[in-house]
Amino acid sequence: MPSFDVVSEVDMQELRNAVDQTQREIDTRYDFKGTAAAIELNEMELTLFGDAEFQVEQVMDILVQKIAKRGIDVGCLEPGKLEEGGGKARRVVKVLAGIETDTARKIVKLIKEAKLKVQAAIQGDKVRVTGKKRDDLQEVIALLRQADVGLPLQYNNFRD
């Protein structure tokens, strides 16, 4: 029986490249000369630094631009609140990867409400969709693309 997986993944190599490009642009831009503007990548967190709130926002804008250019969905970034103190500002941005249980349940519910002849099962941080016909699976993909689940979704491991 044909099946595919619904996942939410981020290509870490592309993310690292986008962060490096952002840091390179910060280093060369005239309006950032002599400031504490910087960006760091630790595991699944980005930390943006600046002298003031507007600088952190500018770093965020540059990052979003570079990430979009590299083909990563900007929806995978979850900005935290801005922390200011001691003449410096910083913001921690979480990188979302993997489908949480609540979101997975929402996806399964959406598929079941569509009354298509497919089964959806939660398997860890992904949702496996199985059906008898390939056309049904393609309808599920179209349905999920239209639905807003709060995460960028990818479809992989398509088996016939």
From Swiss-Prot:
GO molecular function list: nucleotide binding
Keywords: Nucleotide-binding
Cell membrane in keyword set: no
Superkingdom of the source species: Bacteria
GO cellular component: cytosol
Family affiliation: Belongs to the YajQ family.
Job of this protein: Nucleotide-binding protein.
PANTHER family per record: UPF0234 PROTEIN YAJQ (PTHR30476:SF0)
Protein name: Nucleotide-binding protein Tgr7_1196
Top-level taxonomy: Bacteria, Pseudomonadati, Pseudomonadota, Gammaproteobacteria, Chromatiales
